[in-house]
């Protein structure tokens, strides 16, 4: 890993610390959709929205569409996967930060300009999955031993199952509740692991990333299983109908 990636990470963390102090002093009202997240993820999410407000205003002034920003974010995430594949984990983490900011801004642009729609949501969801595939594939390619690569592949598989369970449930008319290790949790965990990996001596950086992939595997697998159980139960209740004795409309 290059010294330039370490310098980049230090500058990024210093900027984050400075804006964090400003955020703590300003205490802005959090966006409505961020109120669903609590704990560290909620704090980081509200801070990220605060930091990206100037970028949001610039994007709207330049008349950038939400889909254009979504595409830029996906391209940045793909580049992060490429850097991860060659072992430049610090740069991969930095790019993942900027890609995540694009992921925040695109939805805000759509809401601010009244251009929300199913087509944009479909594009965003698919590019999110592509970004995750690129990131975990890059880690699988660069981690030094077979067990670490297996953890990266397992983390990818379990992450996709979390998304698929929700998508399939909603396709069958069942709303899936938010719980467990969702995409924001996975992204933040990998982001911090990649940002700090360049500073861990020896093989410690690879072990840190392997551990992060293992945590994602366990957490996402449990989340996917929980969603499957919840959605299956709700579908069964729908089939049984109000009386609970059989499919709705049966004699």
Predicted regions and their residues:
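Alpha-helical membrane segments and adjacent membrane-interface helices in multi-pass membrane proteins
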Residues: 74, 83, 90-108
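Hydrophobic alpha-helical transmembrane segments
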Residues: 1-90, 135-251
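Active-site His/Glu-centered metal-binding helix of metallohydrolases
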Residues: 101-109, 122, 126-130, 161, ...
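Basic, amphipathic juxtamembrane/active-site segments
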Residues: 96, 107-150
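Residue-level recognition of specific faces of alpha-helices
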Residues: 68, 94-97, 101, 118, ...
């Amino acid at each position: 890993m290059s010294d330039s990636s370490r310098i980049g990470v230090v500058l990024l963390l210093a900027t984050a610390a400075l804006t964090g102090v400003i955020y703590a002093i300003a205490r802005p009202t959090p966006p409505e959709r961020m109120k669903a997240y609590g704990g560290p993820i909620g704090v980081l999410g509200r801070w990220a929205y605060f930091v990206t407000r100037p970028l949001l205003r610039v994007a709207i002034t330049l008349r950038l569409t939400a889909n254009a920003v979504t595409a830029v974010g996906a391209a940045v995430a793909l580049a992060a996967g490429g850097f991860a594949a060659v072992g430049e984990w610090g740069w991969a983490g930095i790019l993942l930060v900027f890609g995540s900011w694009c992921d925040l801004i695109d939805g805000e642009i759509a809401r601010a300009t009244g251009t929300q729609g199913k087509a944009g949501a479909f594009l965003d969801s698919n590019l999110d999955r592509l970004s995750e595939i690129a990131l975990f594939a890059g880690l699988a390619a660069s981690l030094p031993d077979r067990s670490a690569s297996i953890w990266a592949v397992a983390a990818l598989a379990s992450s996709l199952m979390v998304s698929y369970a929700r998508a399939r449930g909603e396709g069958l008319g069942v709303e899936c509740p938010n719980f467990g290790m969702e995409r924001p949790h996975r992204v933040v965990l990998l982001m911090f692991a990649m940002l700090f990996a360049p500073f861990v001596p020896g093989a410690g950086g690879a072990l840190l990333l392997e551990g992060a992939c293992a945590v994602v595997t366990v957490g996402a697998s449990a989340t996917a299983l929980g969603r499957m159980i919840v959605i299956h139960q709700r579908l069964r209740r729908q089939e049984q109908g109000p009386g609970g004795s059989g499919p709705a409309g049966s004699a």
